[in-house]
Structures are given as structure tokens and as C-alpha cells.
């Protein structure tokens, strides 16, 4: 029964994140902002966390789950690129090198930022971050 509670908690936390992202998308549509709706949602999410309107405990496990499974979210992008590969007139080796390097940069920078935030968060709680 304990696993069921953890799954429900995770789904609720993911739901909160998805709703905030959806609200960001709607804000972008209404105000015709030159940013992607998901970026507006991310900024909104950041503000809600900063001003403690949404406590970190409400979304922490869901966010950690998304960070752990982030690599799977890049796969549809690569498959989509493969569908239009015949329309790409660039040097294929250069094109795929840029994709691989860009993906590595995003993954490494995301991991670095997440690690720094985790250490900072644990430091605030008074826990040794390297236990």
C-alpha cells in the first residue's frame, strides 16, 4: 500500500507541474509573448517557488523524477529530426555533431545546476550535502 501512496503523491506533484506549464502556455497565447509557453510556465513556476506560494515539498519528488528521466524526453526530438533528415541540406556529419554536442551541453548544464541547487537546499536544511 505504501508504494501506491508514493505513486499517487508523484502523480499529484507532476500534475501541479503540468498545470503550471499549461497556465504559462495560456498566458503566452493570451498576451502573444515572443517566448514559448513552456518557458513562460517555467518562469511562473520559479516565481511561485521563490515567493513560497507553491512550497518546494509540493513538487520536489515530481521534479526529481523529471530530472532523472530527462534523457527520455530528448528521444522524440531526435526521432522527429530523423523524419525530416532528407530535407536537411547541411553536411550530415556537422549537423549530427551539433545535435550531439548541444544535447550534451544541455544535459551537463542541467545536471550541474540541479546539483548546485541540491547542495544549496541541503545546506539550508543543515544536512551535510555530501552524505
From Swiss-Prot:
Q: How does it sit in the membrane?
A: Multi-pass membrane protein
Q: Does the keyword Transmembrane apply?
A: yes
Per the UniProt record, one Pfam family is LrgA
Q: Where in the cell is it found?
A: Cell membrane
- What keywords sit in the KW lines? Cell membrane, Cytolysis, Membrane, Transmembrane, Transmembrane helix
Q: Keyword Transmembrane helix, does the record have it?
A: yes
* Any single GO BP term: killing of cells of another organism
> Transmembrane segments in this chain: where?
7-25, 30-49, 62-82, 92-114
* Gene Ontology cellular component annotations, sorted alphabetically: plasma membrane
Which protein family is named in the record? Belongs to the CidA/LrgA family. CidA subfamily.
Question: What does the protein in this record do?
Answer: Increases the activity of extracellular murein hydrolases possibly by mediating their export via hole formation. Inhibited by the antiholin-like proteins LrgAB. In an unstressed cell, the LrgAB products probably inhibit the function of the CidAB proteins. When a cell is stressed by the addition of antibiotics or by other factors in the environment, the CidAB proteins possibly oligomerize within the bacterial cell membrane, creating lesions that disrupt the proton motive force, which in turn results in loss of cell viability.
* Protein name per Swiss-Prot or TrEMBL: Holin-like protein CidA
Recorded source organism is Staphylococcus aureus (strain N315)
Amino acid at each position: 500500500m505504501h508504494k501506491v501512496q508514493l505513486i499517487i503523491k508523484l502523480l499529484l506533484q507532476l500534475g501541479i507541474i503540468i498545470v503550471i506549464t499549461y497556465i504559462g502556455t495560456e498566458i503566452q497565447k493570451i498576451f502573444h509573448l515572443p517566448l514559448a509557453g513552456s518557458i513562460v510556465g517555467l518562469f511562473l513556476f520559479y516565481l511561485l517557488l521563490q515567493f513560497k506560494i507553491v512550497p518546494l515539498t509540493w513538487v520536489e519528488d515530481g521534479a526529481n523524477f523529471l530530472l532523472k528521466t530527462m534523457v527520455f524526453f530528448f528521444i522524440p526530438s531526435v526521432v522527429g529530426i530523423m523524419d525530416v533528415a532528407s530535407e536537411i541540406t547541411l553536411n550530415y556529419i556537422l549537423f549530427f555533431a551539433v545535435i550531439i554536442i548541444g544535447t550534451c551541453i544541455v544535459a551537463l548544464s542541467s545536471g550541474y545546476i540541479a546539483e548546485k541547487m541540491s547542495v544549496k537546499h541541503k545546506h539550508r536544511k543543515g544536512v551535510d550535502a555530501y552524505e
